[in-house]
Amino acid sequence: MLCVAGAKLKRELDATATVLANRQDESEQSRKRLIEQSREFKKNTPEDLRKQVAPLLKSFQGEIDALSKRSKEAEAAFLTVYKRLIDVPDPVPALDVGQQLEIKVQRLHDIETENQKLRETLEEYNKEFAEVKNQEVTIKALKEKIREYEQTLKSQAETIALEKEQKLQNDFAEKERKLQETQMSTTSKLEEAEHKLQTLQTALEKTRTELFDLKTKYDEETTAKADEIEMIMTDLERANQRAEVAQREAETLREQLSSANHSLQLASQIQKAPDVAIEVLTRSSLEVELAAKEREIAQLVEDVQRLQASLTKLRENSASQISQLEQQLNAKNSTLKQLEEKLKGQADYEEVKKELNTLKSMEFAPSEGAGTQDSTKPLEVLLLEKNRSLQSENATLRISNSDLSGSARRKGRDQPESRRPGPLPASPPPQLPRNTGEQVSNTNGTHHFSPAGLSQDFFSSNLASPSLPLASTGKFALNSLLQRQLMQSFYSKAMQEAGSTSTIFSTGPYSTNSISSPSPLQQSPDVNGMAPSPSQSESAGSISEGEEIDTAEIARQVKEQLIKHNIGQRIFGHYVLGLSQGSVSEILARPKPWNKLTVRGKEPFHKMKQFLSDEQNILALRSIQGRQRENPGQSLNRLFQEVPKRRNRSEGNITTRIRASETGSDEAIKSILEQAKRELQVQKTAEPVQTSSTSSSGNSDDAIRSILQQARREMEAQQAALDPALKPAPLSQPDLTILTPKHLSASPMSTVSTYPPLAISLKKTPAAPETSTAALPSAPALKKEAQDVPTLDPPGSADAAQGVLRPMKSELVRGSTWKDPWWSPIQPERRNLTSSEETKADETTASGKERAGSSQPRAERSQLQGPSASAEYWKEWPSAESPYSQSSELSLTGASRSETPQNSPLPSSPIVPMAKPAKPSVPPLTPEQYEVYMYQEVDTIELTRQVKEKLAKNGICQRIFGEKVLGLSQGSVSDMLSRPKPWSKLTQKGREPFIRMQLWLNGELGQGVLPVQGQQQGPVLHSVASLQDPLQQGCVSSESTPKTSASCSPAPESPMSSSESVKSLTELVQQPCPAIETSKEGKPPEPSDPPASDSQPTTPLPLSGHSALSIQELVAMSPELDTYGITKRVKEVLTDNNLGQRLFGETILGLTQGSVSDLLARPKPWHKLSLKGREPFVRMQLWLNDPNNVEKLMDMKRMEKKAYMKRRHSSVSDSQPCEPPSVGIDYSQGASPQPQHQLKKPRVVLAPEEKEALKRAYQQKPYPSPKTIEELATQLNLKTSTVINWFHNYRSRIRRELFIEEIQAGSQGQAGASDSPSARSSRAAPSSEGDSCDGVEATDAEEPGGNIVATKSQGGLAEVAAAPADREEATQPAEKAKAQPLCSGTPGQDDGEDASRPRPLPEGLADAPAPVPSLAAPAAGEDAATSATAPATATEAPGAARAGPAERSSALPSTSAPANAPARRPSSLQSLFGLPEAAGARDNPVRKKKAANLNSIIHRLEKAASREEPIEWEF
């Protein structure tokens, strides 16, 4: 440190030395200059001045000298010090040496201490060493001791080992002896076991032989019983035939008798007395003959009954025997099982096998001659086969014998029958008829019964009524009948070919439903060769039960064919299998093995096999696919799809039912002739050997003749169907009656039989599905039927159809309810608009729905169908086009209302088919979006959990989410969210919804679903679905829906009596949303929290603390509640305080009285409730927790009474309209749960230039977009809510002027004649008046892009509103006409706006949809007589008489105002309802969204109300 300081000091000293040297030089220089200057001064200055200055200069000189002397001395001193310091030697090396010495001294100290320690340790070690020396001696002694111990141990161990060895040897000898003993005992036991085994084997053989005997006996008995039953049945059939013949004869005799009676009466009138005797004689002879016939009939009936009784006895006996045999069999089986269990593991069958082989070689090889095959068959099988062949021979001989003896026996009995007028020869039963439902009347006029057909319905339905009951014939009856007829044909062959019948009778248990052997198919190849019948697939399934189908192979082949010919699975499923695309995809992708399929599950594979068997099927299907691709929009396409849809259960062969629309009568005739050939072949194969050739030729001639007659009828029917199609004139009622018999006779049972009775009753068509196509007056449908019918028509079915026709005709006359859209030729452009949607919708609808085109006007159609049909039609009236469609709100109130088409107020407007709402369509995902998620693993469970949370948090229902984001139905969404599949198990299509969910969570998709935050305007809603959704979610659950403000209720001063208000209000109760529900007792709606949109944005609960959270969030976060306890407490509070459930429901829960009553009476447990279902209980709990709950409800009740009295008073004092409304109750007092919001809202007054600007904007765009509204607001320095309200009020005023004029015109009796549908279509009830812009910011629901789309109320074409020029023309009077004060006391108009005279608007503007009214109170300062009230007072039932808002009522009485009086202006007084101010609540987006939804409902109700004839309104 010192050396550093010294070096520093040296440097400083050096610097100062150099500075001093420099200063010395400088001072010398300056001194010289001073001397020179003084010299010059002496020279230049005058002397007197020098004298004056001399002393001063001298003193300066002296001072300078002294200073210089001082400085020199100082410098000298410094230099001496400096020299000395320079001479001092460098101290650094000395310091280093000192430091080293210090270190050495330190080390010395350390070494001394260490030495001391070492000395100490050395002393210790020395001591230890001494001790160790002493221990060595002891160690040696110890070692010696150890050696001794070891020696002793060794000796002990040896002795112990010897002892043990001895012991073990003894044990071994003993065990060996025992082992020998056990061996002896086991050998003896083994011998016993072998002996037992032999005895058991012999017992087993015995039981097997017994079992075999039992089986053979059982088979013999079953075959014998089958033979007996068959004989009984043949007797029964013959008896039936005779009975029928007798009945026919009896009928002819009765007719003769009646005709004779008639003639005798006539004769008696002419000649009374002389002919009495003859008359008596003739009558007596006829009566005698009739009595004989009746006796014969009675005898035949007795025979039939006796045969039936014997048959039932036989059945019972056989059943009891079978059960006994089965019991025996079970017993034997159980013993057999026990024996087998004993034999397991011990049996040795080699010897038995040898014996069997020798037996086979000895017994069966020569007799059967089967060669190598028999060697593989077991002995039992060979014995069974032998026995079976013997039994079958025995059975055939017995049948032929009984046949011969039976015919011989009957010859004597049937002798009188041969003398009858028309004896029927006992011809053999016919072959299986083409149409299973027809009566087999061409040979013996009765059904054929066979053992295979003895089903449960044998006696009940078929025997009791020989003609099949059409409407109730189910699949089972058909199936059994078909099998009966099949078996009958087989038996008839069996009778002829006794030798070849060995395979017909199965020796297995007797089955009623199936033929176990497939051989009948081989024997009668014509069975499958016939044209398709509706039940052929079922019969094929039952016949070919035995044959197994390789399902995987068939599915593979079908897929190959579909891919090869580019046929879609939907088309294939629709036309071939009768299944949906999803089912087809499932069957083809994962075909189940044949043995795991049910009978119904096997059907599609039979159909697919049939489909693959013929190339024509594939080509026909390909042509259909091509046609559908070429013109998918054709409306008629659906008609051709529908007919096969009803028959698509038939089978895989589709060529017979797929017909192009162009095919004409030539093809029909061709197909008929082909069918005739097939019939002939069938008859030839079925013809027994005994029948003569002449009879068969006669039959075939008859068949061909009937077929050709049928063809002629078909062509006539086609012509008749085509004629009306060429011109729009409808088919009249007579035409229908001409056409329907032909069609019905053509296919009496062609489609009925496909459906079971339940399905037929569910379809809303009378008697049978095919009647719809036959009876519909539609050209394409008739044409289609005409082409399809020949393929399904057997000869002789026309007679059978007559019975079907009568009930159908009566049904048609009564009025049947068709669910087909009415295709109107008047509006082709509309059809083009909707056809693509309809075809889409139709593909998803059930195949049972009938649709056909119709050129018939509504009135005639309604005459045909009657009131029930029209009522049905109005139920089925969904309007897919209008976002404000009223269809979903319409409620049928009976035929008395004028809502059916024939008495609708729009006689001239054509009925246009409204498509069912199309499936929710969402824009497809981009390839980029697919690629991001498709190949990465997504946790579906976590994803669905997040989605559910987000949906619950934002209060979005699953239906909206499904429609807007996923493009799925609510059910699919619910299923997906509750049970998500793992990502790895999903197909590409199955992954798409999850990708969409992920994109939605990330904010890349479907943002229109979420409520928009922070916007002044609520979201623009574009579809009915999105508008209606919040209703279904809980009817604006987070809005104070039930507390409908003044804009939702009739004005308190409206001139209505209470009884009339009851009419309108009771109808409102039927509204789907409680938002617009009012009391049934004529009270006004609950105005609590007057428009709660301002005072309480989120819930109608009277709790200010919860305003931050929406009710959905409260429900989602609430713990499990005791629903029973809550309801019990609520009921107690209500009853104790005498509060009604209606008031509580509307004010607190937002529900109707009925819903509240249901909730309180039958509360569900919390865990079984959905989020929506939990909401009322959360509201109840919050209400119960509120200390002021009862007081608030009591206040509401009191105010309701006051308002009711006020209304009655105002209805009485209608003639003084200028009574100031300031005396009205301020509904915010006590009604609002937040008592701090009690200030009335100030009136907004617009300047004239602001009004002019807004009017100009209105003329350009009456429904401005949110962007336009914001621009206007910023330009005019107004609030956006003010601009929105101004537009809304202005539109309402213009519409009201038109409305009042129309009412006035109607009151003069001219409305009915002049009013056009378009002018009446979209008229709305008036809304708030004037330019007052206070109130809640309403949300105008606009079409996208700001287009003004108007929808006609009857579903006509959407029109764009009229051009601005027309609008300008319409609105000019509004600016020119002067306001007239209502009475002398009314102050002038503050805002200075002119009233407008009523003037009709252009049609386009009239048709524009009504604006969405705000939820605000009516404009402040309105006069009650013209003050606008909510359009909600209009009810949803279109035909209902309704008491409208005040404008309508005030304009109606002709005494109060002249017909063309200008509309009266509102006064400047405050409105009846004060609006509380709430700054914070204003921007709540949830409130706005709910308000928008409410407004849309109100708008739809306006439309529904304005559709009616004004003249029909009752006041």
Curated annotation (Swiss-Prot):
Residues 540-627, 929-1016, 1112-1199, 1239-1298 bind DNA. The lineage of its organism: Eukaryota, Metazoa, Chordata, Craniata, Vertebrata. Interacts with BANP. Interacts with SATB1 (via DNA-binding domains); the interaction inhibits the attachment of both proteins to DNA. There is a cross-link at residues 783, 809, 840, 1279 (Glycyl lysine isopeptide (Lys-Gly) (interchain with G-Cter in SUMO2)). It is found in: Nucleus. It comes from Mus musculus. It holds the Pfam family CUT. This is Homeobox protein cut-like 1. Disruption phenotype: Brains from knockout mice show neurons in layer II-III with a significant decrease in the dendritic length and the number of branches, as well as a severe reduction of dendritic spines density.
